[in-house]
Amino acid sequence: MNLLVTSSLGVLLHLVVLCQADDHSELLVNTKSGKVMGTRVPVLSSHISAFLGIPFAEPPVGNMRFRRPEPKKPWSGVWNASTYPNNCQQYVDEQFPGFSGSEMWNPNREMSEDCLYLNIWVPSPRPKSTTVMVWIYGGGFYSGSSTLDVYNGKYLAYTEEVVLVSLSYRVGAFGFLALHGSQEAPGNVGLLDQRMALQWVHDNIQFFGGDPKTVTIFGESAGGASVGMHILSPGSRDLFRRAILQSGSPNCPWASVSVAEGRRRAVELGRNLNCNLNSDEELIHCLREKKPQELIDVEWNVLPFDSIFRFSFVPVIDGEFFPTSLESMLNSGNFKKTQILLGVNKDEGSFFLLYGAPGFSKDSESKISREDFMSGVKLSVPHANDLGLDAVTLQYTDWMDDNNGIKNRDGLDDIVGDHNVICPLMHFVNKYTKFGNGTYLYFFNHRASNLVWPEWMGVIHGYEIEFVFGLPLVKELNYTAEEEALSRRIMHYWATFAKTGNPNEPHSQESKWPLFTTKEQKFIDLNTEPMKVHQRLRVQMCVFWNQFLPKLLNATACDGELSSSGTSSSKGIIFYVLFSILYLIF
């Protein structure tokens, strides 16, 4: 009997040792940069391998501030990839201290300029050559972190058996200060950080069980715009296969500026910090001498006007990363032609109104007076002259009930969302689909049951992300069973699209997500209800933003009387009416 027990214990001990050896071999990966040791993390009823904080570039510190990234030099020994890395230096939202709704987007690790790292989640056992999905965070190009709880890749990687990567990139002036012509601060280095991370993934992901030929990049807001920018940029096109854009596209009005405007903002930053402005060299030297927080504290001062949904340091159309203007590239088909999946949320504007428009509060219904509505319109369309503002007001006012505070509130939500997210994305998708080979469009209109923001904010910008990353699968977070099912469905759509270029299962009996075509323009709702197919998302408003208003502003750009402050003249009103009639006719 004792011999049997001893023998059984020996076998058990041998199995434990073998399991530990298997765990160790799964967690130790030899990349082209060097060896990395990951960690085993629990996920639902199982576990997954995580490799956190792998460097892909040299730290952009000291004289490397504002410069293009340089590849990480190979290291000896084993890199400890068991904890999240630093977050990049950035503006921290302190509007609502202690409020989880806003603080969930703030950095959750120490901030540092040494921040160019990526994180990888790998199914266990390690796959042979599986699909790879690379996440690019949003944050208006002034904020964002790969380490946020809402971006935890373990649920999506585990549930859909994909390798999930999240990368980091410099934001604010650190990533997008642009003095065109200077090698010391060329601009767009945040986008080049992203590209360098994609290059690292391309060169190394096979060692983690991923297939470098089936990489899908996906992102939200500025991350979605970034994804679109890599579709456009010739230097990025070979580093991924497919793309998903959530609530952002490269042509959004806040997502880029001219090189001249980029330079003006860089000089204005220096002026705010008492730098010598005699030359680029002196300006850059001065800005490099400043502490990071000094730059962050004054970055909002460089904007040319008071506005909502505009950010200080963003990509510039430089002739290099972007060979020509975005519109000319879209018109000519000068972009990567592949399958894309993209969409928007129902209430894209509400979050931004809370941070700048008069009359809005998270602690009330935010019923908006007519006076506050008019002020909000001016902040929402800061580039428009008075006639343009009148056109926006006319388009979004219920003139049978123009003093209704709820309608005024919801009208501003629609103005900000249509102008900054929905209609730019619709313009992009229509242009892209003429040349691409498979497009799928969604409209996310489910408000989470546990959302802490007030009801009036609706289905908020950014709040589809938790469904994409599988948070409703976590029982402790108090989502409903229907929301868990929605999250599983969205994850499966995203992953199936990444694997095949089509979000639909080939032999499924469920309703099919139809292709978007320029003729029919079909899209689906994403919510807890059975699938519904619609056509021509926000078409009336998007014709206004994408066609009518630009022509109106162009036609009146040189007319001082029509652009003067105060109420438009009778001449302006007559001009507007005639222009509208002619536009509708022709």
Swiss-Prot record:
Which regions span the lipid bilayer? Answer: none
* Propiece residues: 565-586
Q: Which GO terms describe its cellular component?
A: extracellular space; plasma membrane; side of membrane; synapse; synaptic cleft
Query: What is its EC class?
Result: hydrolase
Q: What outcome follows a substitution of H461Q?
A: Loss of activity
State the UniProt keywords alphabetically.
Cell membrane, Disulfide bond, Glycoprotein, GPI-anchor, Hydrolase, Lipoprotein, Membrane, Neurotransmitter degradation, Serine esterase, Signal, Synapse
* Quaternary assembly: Isoform H form is a homodimer; the asymmetric form is a disulfide-bonded oligomer composed of a collagenic subunit (Q) and a variable number of T catalytic subunits.
Indicate the family of this protein: Belongs to the type-B carboxylesterase/lipase family.
Name it: Acetylcholinesterase
Task: Please give the organism.
Answer: Tetronarce californica
Gene name in the database record = ache
